[in-house]
């Protein structure tokens, strides 16, 4: 390594010898892998050729820093790292998690419920991870999960908390071993950690640890009635919604939407309003220029501009339109954009959007605590396009209806919160790989009567306007209860079991979402 080095190739500066250390403390950059240039990744992989088996192409900078720290740490030494919580379940860090679980005794994972991060002005949730580099694995190695409900105000309080954690870590118990108004401490064996490297986030996904047990007991008891979503999606999703930037840099996709009503025209680029529906197409009007253009059906697709404010499961009759292909007045239409576009680009746009059509949609980057978030998954009887803030999937109409019920159920809400990529509190974020792993009702194993009962419930609630998710849970909104009861019945729960489970889930999930909302505000 060189003092004054300006490139990864080590150019310039005088040599500084680095010795192996007993302790390595780091707060590495949280830069996402998407922002690392491909050429830079190639150099990093070359630099870490000895550890290439731990490197993933979608690994952020902090993953490389963990590997770097290992190079300079003595056997028996300790790592102390400030990391984004996403390190616990991101696919790109799976190899690093396996490396830490195999080569280290992960002694402590510490987080806080008071605010998203320990660092000032940080937007993403953080954890503190302390691990000891070990040569031999011991059966009695324990990982202590500490969740601070209140952050220490000064050094004295911090020292007292550290002493309490150290003392409780020696207790020969399992699960939640200490819980008061300031702190919750849980103990898990390293074998449990190693067996859970796919999703270590589950150990701190909920303040109420019983919720994890409920989900695990359901999957163990009813695994034969559930299947992965990927079994039904196959190659038909999930696909991210449309983005004009995939075809034209800096383009505003709102210019391509035809809005059904004025109240949906919220942004500057939302300029086209549906004026009249005709046999051969639609007439649309520019809200500022007051000019009218006729667009034939062949150049249009049904589309959803944004999911916020849509509160029904079935959006078939609420969809807007999107221009996706060339038409006689296309040049006039494109002239109203804030930049010049070649009409020939519409053929590329058509090919791109055609691949993204779906009939069941899942929200992404959604604030589950927001007043405008009422539905998590939408159904459409017409193939449609959705924005980048949603996932699009294409399956049979029958399965789409049943999965829409499941994805909006309280059992699935429990699953979503457990598997979410932690970013900013109540925001739900998933990647395609996560969604394919979701457990859903195995439609192929349902009887005709069970399918008929579920479709009957779907028809009953498909047009109902749901309040926001929090209000649904707080007030036990009747349509949510109908969905939950129908699904639990299919899964084999009797009346008493159903009542007991829902009586616990509704207030518990409400509390968790409110807690996540507090994280964002803190």
Task: Give the predicted meaning of each segment.
Residues 1-12:
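S-adenosyl-L-methionine
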Residues 485-522:
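Conserved AMP-binding
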Residues 14-256:
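Signature of N6-adenine DNA methyltransferases within the class I
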Residues 63, 73, 204, 209-460, ...:
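Polybasic, glycine- and aromatic-enriched phosphate-binding surface used to engage nucleic acids
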Residues 460-479, 483-486, 490:
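Flexible helix-coil linker/hinge segments at domain or subdomain boundaries
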Residues 156, 295, 449-452, 474, ...:
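Alpha-helix boundary/N-cap detector
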Residues 1, 115-122, 481-494:
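Short, conserved secondary-structure transition motifs
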Residues 24-27, 31, 68, 72, ...:
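Generic, well-ordered alpha-helical scaffold segments in large soluble proteins
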């Amino acid at each position: 390594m060189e003092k004054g080095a300006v490139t990864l190739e080590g150019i310039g500066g005088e040599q500084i010898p680095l010795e192996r250390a007993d302790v390595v403390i780091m707060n590495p950059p949280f830069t996402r892998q998407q922002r690392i240039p491909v050429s830079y990744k190639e150099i990093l992989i070359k630099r870490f050729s000895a550890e290439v088996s731990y490197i993933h192409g979608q690994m952020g900078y902090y993953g490389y820093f963990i590997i770097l720290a290992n190079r300079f740490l003595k056997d028996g030494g300790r790592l102390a790292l400030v990391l984004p919580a996403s390190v616990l379940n991101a696919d790109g860090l799976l190899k690093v998690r396996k490396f830490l679980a195999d080569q280290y005794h992960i002694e402590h994972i510490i987080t806080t419920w008071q605010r998203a991060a320990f660092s000032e002005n940080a937007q993403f949730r953080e954890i503190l991870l302390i691990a000891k580099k070990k040569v031999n694995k011991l059966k009695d190695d324990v990982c202590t999960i500490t969740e601070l409900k209140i952050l220490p105000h000064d050094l004295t309080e911090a020292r007292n908390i550290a002493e309490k954690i150290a003392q409780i870590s020696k207790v020969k118990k399992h699960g939640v071993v200490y819980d008061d108004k300031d702190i919750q401490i849980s103990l898990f064996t390293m074998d449990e950690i190693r067996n859970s490297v796919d999703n270590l986030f589950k150990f701190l996904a909920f303040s109420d640890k019983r919720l994890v047990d409920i989900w695990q007991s359901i999957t163990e008891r009813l695994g034969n009635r559930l299947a992965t979503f990927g079994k039904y999606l196959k190659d038909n999703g999930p696909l991210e919604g449309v983005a004009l930037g995939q075809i034209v840099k800096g383009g505003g996709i709102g210019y391509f939407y035809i809005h059904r009503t004025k109240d949906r025209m919220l942004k500057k680029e939302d300029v086209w309003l549906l004026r009249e529906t005709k046999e051969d197409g639609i007439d649309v009007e520019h809200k500022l220029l007051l000019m009218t253009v006729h667009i034939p059906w062949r150049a249009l697709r049904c589309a959803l501009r944004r999911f916020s404010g849509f509160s029904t499961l079935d959006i078939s009759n609420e969809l807007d339109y999107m221009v996706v292909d060339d038409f006689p007045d296309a040049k006039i239409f494109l002239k109203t954009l804030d930049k010049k576009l070649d009409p020939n680009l519409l053929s590329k746009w058509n090919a791109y959007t055609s691949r993204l059509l779906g009939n069941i949609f899942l929200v992404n980057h959604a604030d589950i605590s927001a007043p405008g978030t009422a539905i998590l998954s939408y159904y459409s009887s017409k193939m449609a396009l959705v924005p980048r803030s949603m996932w699009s999937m294409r399956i049979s109409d029958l399965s789409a209806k049943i999965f829409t019920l499941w994805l909006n159920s309280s059992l699935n809400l429990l699953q979503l919160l457990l598997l979410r990529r932690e970013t900013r509190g109540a925001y739900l974020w998933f990647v395609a790989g996560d969604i394919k792993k979701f457990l859903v009702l195995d439609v192929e194993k349902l009887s005709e009567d069970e399918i008929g009962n579920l479709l009957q419930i779907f028809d009953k609630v498909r047009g109902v306007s749901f309040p926001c998710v929090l209000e649904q849970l707080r007030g036990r909104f009747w349509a949510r209860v109908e969905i939950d009861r129908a699904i639990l019945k299919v899964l084999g729960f009797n009346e008493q079991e159903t009542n007991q489970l829902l009586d616990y889930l509704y207030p518990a999930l409400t509390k968790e979402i409110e807690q996540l909302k507090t994280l964002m505000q803190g």
